[in-house]
Amino acid sequence: MIRSALSNWREYLTPVSHKSTFLTTGQITPEEFVQAGDYLCHMFPTWKWNDMADDNKYRDFLPKDKQFLVIRKVPCSERAQAVVTMDEIENGTSTDAFSAADDEDNDDDSIEIIPVSKSSSGADNDVNDIDELMEEMELEEDDDIVANKTNEMLRYYDLFITYSTSYRVPKMYIVGFNGNGTPLTPKEMFEDITPDYRKKTATIEKLPFYKRNVPSVSIHPCKHANVMKVLLDKISVVKERQREEEMQKNAEVGAPKSAGSDDGDNENWEDLQQDIDDSLRVDLYLVVFLKFITSVTPTIQHDYTMEGW
């Protein structure tokens, strides 16, 4: 809770910057956040900007109807530890995981199936009917067990994205519910965060844009800008290599250069255009951001959020 309080104070005290440094730092301005949010809502209509309500807290550097993005009731069918365990099993890095799997197999083998003895009388048809009925009942019971287990594991999350003034990047908040709609405790929500990230990037906070107290888990944004900058650099290298290969091909086939006395005058514009083409558009920021978040919350079905209704 101390960390949460310090984070809130930092958000409050940090001045807002309106100077774009996206290409050099991976950070964005509030205006660029709105631009990226508009693109996300346009391409993936499950995401929406906030409603204007009396319960909202408003920050004056953002439009009142674009304070935060929200999507509700995103499915989460299993805990994050299950995904980590499966990865360990596939990579052969965890003997405990194998032991757990073996134990489950042994439990299945220990179930005793008692056959129904057939009568030696002429009532074979009746016995067959009973056998078939028992098989159908057994299948239905198995289906019920699987369904009940699935329902117990199923959770739903409301996801919120707002703008962090202290880090100048988007910040994610998650609020979870069980299958019956009962709010999850912070401890339960932590179960849906990858173990490696629980202590590093996840914090218990109340939603900062509501007046009422809504507990949530926030994904700390301290690394977002660095991740984005690395991605921008990689894109630039790839695009530069592609452009050089294209120029080499044109040179080999003797492609003519464009004529005109204003070629030198256009060089600066062409260089600027190449810089733009070599980078990621800022309106795609939140799409990339959500891909990063999937590594933190792998069992929350973010792919669902990238589809239309």
From Swiss-Prot:
Keywords, alphabetical: Autophagy, Cytoplasm, Protein transport, Transport, Ubl conjugation pathway
Region (Disordered) location: 243-270
Keyword hit for Repressor: no
Organism domain of life: Eukaryota
Localization per Swiss-Prot or TrEMBL: Cytoplasm
Active-site residues, Swiss-Prot/TrEMBL: 222 (glycyl thioester intermediate)
Region feature Flexible region, mapped onto this chain: 83-151
GO MF assignments: Atg8-family ligase activity
Keyword Acetylation included in the entry's annotation: no
GO terms, biological process: autophagosome assembly; autophagy of mitochondrion; cytoplasm to vacuole targeting by the Cvt pathway; glycophagy; piecemeal microautophagy of the nucleus; protein targeting to membrane
One cellular-component annotation, GO: phagophore assembly site
Ranges for region Handle region: 226-284
Pfam family, one: Autophagy_act_C
Subunit and partners: Monomer. Interacts with ATG8 through an intermediate thioester bond through the C-terminal Gly of ATG8. Also interacts with the 40 amino acid C-terminal region of the E1-like ATG7 enzyme. Also interacts with the ATG12-ATG5 conjugate.
Domain notes: The N-terminal region is involved in phosphatidylethanolamine-binding and is required for ATG8-PE conjugation.
Family: Belongs to the ATG3 family.
Functional summary from the UniProt entry: E2 conjugating enzyme required for the cytoplasm to vacuole transport (Cvt) and autophagy. Required for selective autophagic degradation of the nucleus (nucleophagy) as well as for mitophagy which contributes to regulate mitochondrial quantity and quality by eliminating the mitochondria to a basal level to fulfill cellular energy requirements and preventing excess ROS production. Responsible for the E2-like covalent binding of phosphatidylethanolamine to the C-terminal Gly of ATG8.
Stored PANTHER family: UBIQUITIN-LIKE-CONJUGATING ENZYME ATG3
Protein name: Autophagy-related protein 3
Naturally occurring in which organism (per UniProt): Candida glabrata (strain ATCC 2001 / BCRC 20586 / JCM 3761 / NBRC 0622 / NRRL Y-65 / CBS 138)
